[in-house]
Amino acid sequence: MPIIGVPRCLENPFCAPAKFPLSVKKKIRI
């Protein structure tokens, strides 16, 4: 998965858990 979707999802908190798996979601939380 490209990291390009991370900055975009940072703006929308609902986008992170919707497009990224739980493992990645935990990384964004930290």
From Swiss-Prot:
Name this polypeptide is given: Putative UPF0377 protein YNR075C-A
Domain of life: Eukaryota
Recorded family membership: Belongs to the UPF0377 family.
